[in-house]
Structures are given as C-alpha cells and as structure tokens.
From Swiss-Prot:
High-level lineage: Viruses, Varidnaviria, Bamfordvirae, Preplasmiviricota, Tectiliviricetes
Annotated PROSITE patterns: BCL2_FAMILY
Disulfide bond residue pairs: none
Annotated organism of origin: Human adenovirus B serotype 7 (HAdV-7)
GO BP term (any one): symbiont-mediated suppression of host apoptosis
Function, in words: Putative adenovirus Bcl-2 homolog that inhibits apoptosis induced by TNF or FAS pathways, as well as p53-mediated apoptosis. Without E1B 19K function, virus production is compromised because of premature death of host cell. Interacts with Bax protein in cell lysates.
Name of this chain's protein: E1B protein, small T-antigen
C-alpha cells in the first residue's frame, strides 16, 4: 500500500527510483533510502536475469530512447506494467529501475534527465491506470452523480434561441417529392 501512496507524488516517485538505482551507495540506501527503496533494490537484484530476458524481447529500446523517441517505450514497456497489487507494483518499479540503470550506462543524456524521464513516465502511467480504475467503478456512484451523467446539462431556452441562426426561409419551402 505504501508504494501506491508514493506513486501519487512525482517527487517521491523520482526519489524512490533514485534511491533504488545503482547510482546510490548501499550505505546511503540503508540509512536514508527507506524500506521501499531497499525492497525495490532487492527485487531488482533478485530478478536481474528475468529483467534481462524481458529487455532482450524489446530490440531497439535504448536506441529509440537515445534518439528521443518515447512511443516505443510507452508501447512496449509502460503499457504492460501491472499495478494490481502492491507486490506487482513494486516489481514494476524494480523493472523500471533496472531500465534506468541500464540506460544511464549507455546514453549521452545526463543521469538527471534519464531519472526525470523514467519517473515522469511511471507517475503518468500510474495516474492513468488509477483514473481508469476509478472510472470503471463509475456506475456504482451515488444516484445523484449517475443522474447528472445520464442527462447532459441543457442550456436555458433563451440561450438556445440566441445561438440559433436566423433563417427567414425556414419552413417556407414546399416539401420536396422524390
């Protein structure tokens, strides 16, 4: 549950990725990183081989990222992340931290840019999935809210008359027989 609360804030998401990455010493991670950063780092270490296999299935990912193309990353990586449970969410964060570490070693971009890019992508994906989950439960909202959604707001008759174009011939043409 804590991982979901951290993903709600972009700054905390960035800090989590930074503290779980290889760019931070173990001593810093132990004293200042927090329990979740240590957990994500541990998941990343334990599943390194599986993460490597997953990245082998996505050829050209780092080349596209180095050229500034984000669509491949969004389509192949972000779209398949699973946030259904806190454990799967921690594994998704660990996978993105693994990508972060690997990309930093082979890019011309600064570490801060790469970290900001991955943190923002993770945060946006989390927010979009969370909003989709909330909207999936929309029919069980209180009756007042459901009634508002079923009946779109109507404009007062005075405003509707003002917006209608004046057509002096309206209704004067004889019906056309075909």
């Amino acid at each position: 549950m804590e991982v979901w609360a951290i993903l709600e804030d972009l700054r905390q998401t960035r800090l989590l990725l930074e503290n779980a990455s290889d760019g931070v010493s173990g001593l810093w991670r132990f004293w200042f990183g927090g329990d979740l950063a240590r957990l994500v780092f541990r998941i990343k270490q334990d599943y390194r081989e599986e993460f490597e296999k997953l990245l082998d299935d996505i050829p050209g990912l780092f080349e596209a990222l180095n050229l500034g193309h984000q669509a491949h990353f969004k389509e192949k990586v972000l779209s398949v992340l699973d946030f259904s449970t806190p454990g799967r969410t921690a594994a998704a964060v660990a996978f993105l931290t693994f990508i972060l570490d690997k990309w930093i070693r082979q890019t011309h971009f600064s570490k801060g840019y790469v970290l900001d890019f991955i943190a923002a992508a993770l945060w946006r994906t989390w927010k979009a999935r969370r909003m989709r989950t909330i909207l999936d439960y929309w029919p069980v909202q209180p009756l007042g809210v459901a009634g508002i959604l079923r009946h779109p707001p109507t404009m007062p008759a005075v405003l509707q008359e003002e917006q209608q174009e004046d057509n002096p011939r309206a209704g004067l043409d004889p019906p056309v027989e075909e």
